Amino acid sequence: MNQPGETTHFGFRDVPLNDKQTMVNDVFHSVASRYDLMNDLMSGGMHRLWKDVMITTLNPPRDDAPFRLLDVAGGTGDISFRAAKASGAGFQATVCDINTDMLEVGRQRAVQRHLDGQVDFVEGNAEALQFPDRSYDAYTIAFGIRNVPRIDLALKEAYRVLKPGSRFLCLEFSSVDVPGLNKIYDLFSFKVIPEIGRVVTGDAESYQYLVESIRKFPKPYDFAEMMRDAGFARVNWQMMSGGIVALHSGWRL
C-alpha cells in the first residue's frame, strides 16, 4: 500500500508515486504509432540484434510441445512475433501491456503477420497481473520494466505467474562501461534522441523522459539483487554493445 506523500522518479523529476503510471501511459499514447520506427532510429537498428539475442537465450521449443510465453510491456508485439518465428506449433504468447494504443498497434500487426491465432493481446498492469499462479513457461519484458512505478512488485508478479523450472528474461538499457563511449552516448541520448522524437513524432518531451528513465534504472548488480529478493535463482546478466543494454536472466526453480 502506498504511503501518503510517497514519491518516485519520472525521468529526473520526483513525482507522486500514484501519478507515475498515468504519466508513463501518456508518453506511450503519444508515441505508439511510431514506436518501432523510433527504436530503429534511436538505436541504429541495434535493437533488432539485442532482441535476437533475447530470443536465442529464450530458446523456445521448435517442435509441437506446448509453450506459453507472457510478454509484459510488449504492446506492439515485437518480442512475441520474434519468439513465434523461432518456435514450433505449440507456441502461444500473451502480450500484456497497460497502454491500449500500443496493444492496438500490436493486434493489427499480428493479423498482418497471420499470427493472431498464436499471439493474443490483453490490457494489464505488471504490478498486479490477472493471470493464475504458475501458468507460463517464460516471461519476457523488453525495455519496459524501467517504466514500472514499483519494480519490486513487477518482479514478484513475474515470479508468481511462472511455472517452476521456467525463465524470466528482461532486456533493458544499462550503464555504458567503455571509456569515451559514455560521453558519446550521453551526447546522442540527450541532444539527438529528443530531436529525432520531435521530427518523427512531434513529441520531444516523451523521448526526453525515455532517455532520463534509462539513467535512473538500477545498475545491473542492483537489479540482480532485486530479482533474487523476488525469489529468482541462477540470476545473471549479459552486457551488450559496450554496456548500452543488458539481458537479465533468472529462473523460478
Swiss-Prot record:
UniProt keyword list: Menaquinone biosynthesis, Methyltransferase, S-adenosyl-L-methionine, Transferase, Ubiquinone biosynthesis
A biological-process GO annotation: aerobic respiration
Pathway listed: Quinol/quinone metabolism; menaquinone biosynthesis; menaquinol from 1,4-dihydroxy-2-naphthoate: step 2/2; Cofactor biosynthesis; ubiquinone biosynthesis
Positions of S-adenosyl-L-methionine binding: T76, D97, N125, A126
EC numbers on record: 2.1.1.163, 2.1.1.201
Catalytic activity: a 2-demethylmenaquinol + S-adenosyl-L-methionine = a menaquinol + S-adenosyl-L-homocysteine + H(+); a 2-methoxy-6-(all-trans-polyprenyl)benzene-1,4-diol + S-adenosyl-L-methionine = a 5-methoxy-2-methyl-3-(all-trans-polyprenyl)benzene-1,4-diol + S-adenosyl-L-homocysteine + H(+)
UniProt GO molecular function: 2-methoxy-6-polyprenyl-1,4-benzoquinol methyltransferase activity; demethylmenaquinone methyltransferase activity
InterPro entries: SAM-dependent_MTases_sf, UbiE/COQ5_MeTrFase, UbiE/COQ5_MeTrFase_CS
Pfam families with a match to the protein in the record: Ubie_methyltran (PF01209)
CDD domains: AdoMet_MTases (cd02440)
UniProt-listed NCBIfam families: MenG_MenH_UbiE, PRK00216.1-3
Entry function: Methyltransferase required for the conversion of demethylmenaquinol (DMKH2) to menaquinol (MKH2) and the conversion of 2-polyprenyl-6-methoxy-1,4-benzoquinol (DDMQH2) to 2-polyprenyl-3-methyl-6-methoxy-1,4-benzoquinol (DMQH2).
Family, per entry: Belongs to the class I-like SAM-binding methyltransferase superfamily. MenG/UbiE family.
Protein name: Ubiquinone/menaquinone biosynthesis C-methyltransferase UbiE
Organism name: Rhodopseudomonas palustris (strain BisB5)
Upper classification of the organism: Bacteria, Pseudomonadati, Pseudomonadota, Alphaproteobacteria, Hyphomicrobiales
